[in-house]
Amino acid sequence: MRKFFVILMVALVVVLTASAVFAADSDPAKLNYYGYATAGALIGLGAAAGGGGAGMGQGLRGILEGSARNPGVTGKLMTLFIVGLALIESLVIYVLVFVLITFYANPFVK
């Protein structure tokens, strides 16, 4: 079932992107720009998501250890934890917004 799902997703991506690829101009400057933008987006989003996930995991670990040592402060710890998660997630969202701006800002329009 998993192999079928992977093949289905690859086929779907190929079908959805084929028309854009075949209709694109072959200007090397445009190809280089969008190639670098895509590579940067993949690296940036991967680093942001990985770092955010690691930070959230460490935060959860600290909350659980603090609650186990002193159950009376669990409410305060959870409040601080939710605020921390929101700040971590906002960094990932900022990277996503930057990537979307990079993709949709067309420097080749005259």
Swiss-Prot record:
Keywords: ATP synthesis, Cell inner membrane, Cell membrane, CF(0), Hydrogen ion transport, Ion transport, Lipid-binding, Membrane, Transmembrane, Transmembrane helix, Transport
GO molecular function term, any single one: lipid binding
The organism's place on the tree of life at top rank: Bacteria
Keyword Transmembrane helix annotated: yes
Any GO CC annotation of this UniProt entry: proton-transporting two-sector ATPase complex, proton-transporting domain
Biological-process GO terms, alphabetical: proton motive force-driven ATP synthesis
Annotated membrane topology: Multi-pass membrane protein
Function text: F(1)F(0) ATP synthase produces ATP from ADP in the presence of a proton or sodium gradient. F-type ATPases consist of two structural domains, F(1) containing the extramembraneous catalytic core and F(0) containing the membrane proton channel, linked together by a central stalk and a peripheral stalk. During catalysis, ATP synthesis in the catalytic domain of F(1) is coupled via a rotary mechanism of the central stalk subunits to proton translocation. Key component of the F(0) channel; it plays a direct role in translocation across the membrane. A homomeric c-ring of between 10-14 subunits forms the central stalk rotor element with the F(1) delta and epsilon subunits.
Subunit structure: F-type ATPases have 2 components, F(1) - the catalytic core - and F(0) - the membrane proton channel. F(1) has five subunits: alpha(3), beta(3), gamma(1), delta(1), epsilon(1). F(0) has three main subunits: a(1), b(2) and c(10-14). The alpha and beta chains form an alternating ring which encloses part of the gamma chain. F(1) is attached to F(0) by a central stalk formed by the gamma and epsilon chains, while a peripheral stalk is formed by the delta and b chains.
Protein name (Swiss-Prot/TrEMBL): ATP synthase subunit c
Originating species: Thermodesulfovibrio yellowstonii (strain ATCC 51303 / DSM 11347 / YP87)
Gene field: atpE
